[in-house]
Amino acid sequence: MSSLEACSKTDIGLERPINQDSLFCSTAPVGKLPNLFMVADGMGGHNAGDYASQYTIKKMVELIEKSTLSDPVSILREAVRQVNGILLEKSFEDERLRGMGTTLTLATVVDRRLFVMNIGDSRTYLINSRIRQISRDHSFVEELIARGEMTKGSEEYWKKKNIITRAVGAYTSVVPDFFEIPLFGGEHLLLCSDGLTNMADDEDIREIVCSGEDLETRTSQLVDLANRNGGKDNIAVILADLD
């Protein structure tokens, strides 16, 4: 890309006692990756979810910086495999961390290609004249929808939407999804936790992202939108303009 600018913000929301969302936003190289964006939404009692998301972000950066692998998918797959194993060990060693885990959605732009890795239900979008979800939710309701056993937006959907089927640190192995998308310029990249997407319609998100305001203003407006609509969860947002 000729230029890439990004802004990030996380907020506790209006109802949660602690913020279990973590993020990392770098337009500068991280190891062999020319840039790196990550959002993680932790789960677990006490401070376990907070620890899981923060540790995952921190350790992913460390492992990516040290990686001797060459292609983005290999770098990311090996890093998250190691992080998953380390988190499992920590949960076995410390009962306060039992049951912890975290979602992870991650993006990097290499030349004119977007690489996305996803585990759980935090999301990555590409936005221009339309809003396009790149990542795929690993959730109980999405599996039922895929089998034709549930309708998106139904009462049952909202009751069970937060049950995720994949997470970092929750199972002995972790299976991320990878997506590779060509870029043409003029797109906006959005990574966020469900604290935004559960509180805001896609079109309202797209309108803010494409409003023409400066990056910091638009990023803050997305967080404000989630809080204005109830702020029932922590909110993490990374917004990047791809030119």
Predicted regions and their residues:
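PP2C/PPM-type serine/threonine phosphatase catalytic domain
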Residues: 1-243
